[in-house]
Amino acid sequence: MNAKLIGLTVWLTLASTAVMSQGFAGLGQTAEGYAVPTPEPSFSFPADHGPHPDFRVEWWYLTAVLEGEDGETYGVQWTLFRSALRPEGDVQVWMGHAGVTTPDEHFTGERLARGEIGQAGVTSQPFAAWIDDWSMQSRAVEGDPLDALQLRASLDQAAYTLDLNANGPLVFHGDKGFSIKSNSGQASYYYSQPFYEVKGLLRLPKGDVEVKGQGWLDREWSSQPLDADQFGWDWFSLSFEGGNRLMGFGLRDVSGMSFTYASWVTLDGEVTSSNDLRLTPLRTAQVAGRDVPVDWRIELPSQGLDITTSALNDESWQATLFPYWEGPVTASGTHEGQGYLEMTGY
């Protein structure tokens, strides 16, 4: 029995139908018994870079848009998810996702593990996150541990080793890191490091490619981040010429886009929160037998933003246990830039 099958067997044994009913960790289920985010959070670093086992779900989520020495654009994803299967926090499971996107190909990897045996985990000081041989590890000799990272992952047909250096501060979404996700008040704790300069090496079927570009790390944890009626989301992280950044998302229910939010981030890390974000699908593509909106119009009137985003590769489908679309995009219009789009529930 191979390692992935063993991991999947463990996962399905530990994860009840209820937990899996709304995607990873049952994101829309009641949080009864688990810790819940509260307004006016007080973060403590580096401790809060580490896990919070009394919350149901948590992730360390990095994406990067890279330019190769061959002139091509590439995208990279590295994600580690943690889920507590009981409120006591004594039964944890971990899931890792990695992706490499080129204009013509998309490579996906997935790892599954249970906690407490060393196969996967996160430490806050020194900072390290890992599952099997995939790792995100601090290289910082002073300051915040996330200021400098090394990232590694190996997939069936691709691999990467990347060094990341932050040239800006951590930023906090919502109200100082308390990020509301619905009109009913479901929320998460959510902060990011959106200012990474990235360089390193991709290993692809065509050969090794040296790359450099920009990266974005999201840190988020909660116990019920979605309303029970919400079944999908569309999430953007964009970096614009001139240095401003945008994090924006829309959450969907049967009536359509039910809740939106945006963080407008200046070059010095100042965040302006807004709920006037408008997301409009412009073009759909048949991906994995589904109609997926791969080009979007994004409007944020409070910042004079009106842009169109276009996918680098329509086929950026993560065919994982809980499948979704994740890939690099370019932005044009009132602002020019690039970034990442994640879509679930299609």
Feature-to-residue mapping (PLM):
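Bacterial N-terminal signal peptides that target proteins for export
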Residues: M1-L8
